[in-house]
Regions:
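Conserved SAM/AdoMet-binding glycine-rich loop
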Residues: 1-106, 111-113
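C-terminal accessory regions of radical SAM enzymes
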Residues: 104, 119-187
Length: 187
């Protein structure tokens, strides 16, 4: 029955972790001929997508794809315990841009992780610039929150606890005093 719902946003950054279930969901949407647009504002796992899952998702009503790279540095991926396959991530974004040019693509990145170098941050910027088409490439500055594993890591690598406290109230686009490299690089 048509209940008047035309847009659904999934606030779930692991919605596509189980590819079989992800594909089954969109196959059901297609089978039931639902006229609904789907959005993923908190991002999908970009390296876990496949051409098949991308095709089914787009045919099933996805308007675009939001993915989070965070960093294009393999070392920083390990530090963050994200460990995504950067090349597969790139291939999937390129496929979406080529096969679905009207799909709205959003890419989330961050810089300013403790121990990150300017060269590693530049790897992420170079990744963004190398992409043929991204509608919304976002770069945020890392915030270190008290009581987290990231805070422990930062303190173990010389980040001042006072700088962490000072950074808490800053917006994600403001330069944090915890930045591990030149402020000029970020601005």
């Amino acid at each position: 029955a048509d209940m008047g719902i035309k847009r659904i946003e999934f606030i779930d950054d692991i919605f596509n972790v189980k590819e079989k279930d992800f594909i089954a969901f969109f196959n059901k949407v297609i089978q039931d001929n639902l006229d609904v647009s789907f959005f993923f504002p908190t991002a999908l796992k970009g390296d876990l997508l496949t051409k098949e899952s991308i095709d089914i998702m787009m045919q099933g009503g996805a308007v675009g794809v939001n993915v989070s790279l965070e960093s294009a540095s393999p070392r920083m991926q390990k530090v963050m315990r994200k460990n995504l396959d950067i090349e597969r991530f790139r291939e999937n974004l390129e496929y979406i841009a080529k096969a679905y040019p009207s799909a709205v693509t959003t890419l989330n990145t961050m810089h300013g992780f403790p121990t990150e170098t300017e060269e590693e941050a530049k790897m992420t910027l170079d990744f963004i610039l190398s992409m043929k088409w991204i509608h919304f490439p976002y770069t945020h500055i890392v915030r270190i929150f008290p009581g987290t594993d990231l805070e422990k890591f930062a303190l173990n690598h010389g980040v001042d606890k006072g700088a962490i406290s000072e950074a808490i109230d800053k917006s994600y686009h403001e330069v944090a005093p915890t930045l591990p490299f030149s402020r000029d690089f970020t601005e």
